[in-house]
């Protein structure tokens, strides 16, 4: 995607209010927003609830359609839709992960996954919806197999991190799992084809140009050959791999550091997300959102990235999550300690400039 040297602006189109505590996580429902299906966003909060927001076809504004409550008794830290959009997984500080089934707009808790010793921090579905991963403060990563009738079986408990695991994320097209932690590392997990055992195949840490403090989040580009991560060390790092070799089943393919973006946030960067058309968004404890794109004149092997836009005071407090819409390329949602969710649209500010001249 070519981003010419013109001015862009991130316009706030709606502020979603209703949560009574900080909002931790966001998840856009897949396959919504096309063929007349409305865009749907889930948000989860320290108020122990999940809210489902749906865009009105007539007004274009988002309205709260459901509040998922009375299941978790502590903070809901993370939420994720299954690829089909039929199930929503929610991870909570109460040490459980709940599975909600969406039937005609109504949500029923159909399964509760137990096993973590304490707070569950993150939940992620693989591309086919056959596996679910969770992680927590107990330093472990759990992989669950999705069985018929909304049953879930733990197939592996991965004990590689030495501290709290902040996030798990499946690769967008392959059954390879990534986790990031308070131990300053990202770990890559893969299944051994011979004996079905999951094991760590690579650790990205300080020794291979990785982060020097807590890694809070990571995200993949659309083709799955690059990954972006963010950290308490105030940097954003881009990693790359040989995706064709990986897809061919070569188990020796590794991820390498490509670029470090620093000096753009002055407090902890809590969230990064890569849009389908190549824009990296970041949200941080400095209440700001930043957008980055790849430099057109960078080399294939050593790409560099430039700041596309900065939005100061995007929220009144820390920004915990930024998520691009899966269907609307230029729509971004953000969640904050200020208890709100905001919907943003990215556009050129050229039109506004001409009108004001």
Predicted regions and their residues:
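A structural motif specific to WD40 beta-propellers
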Residues: 11-13, 61-66, 108-111, 152-156, ...
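WD40/WD-repeat beta-propeller blade N-cap
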Residues: 16-23, 68-76, 113-120, 158-165, ...
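Loop/turn segments within WD40 beta-propeller blades
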Residues: 27-38, 79-85, 124-129, 169-175, ...
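WD40-repeat beta-propellers
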Residues: 50-54, 97-102, 123, 141-145, ...
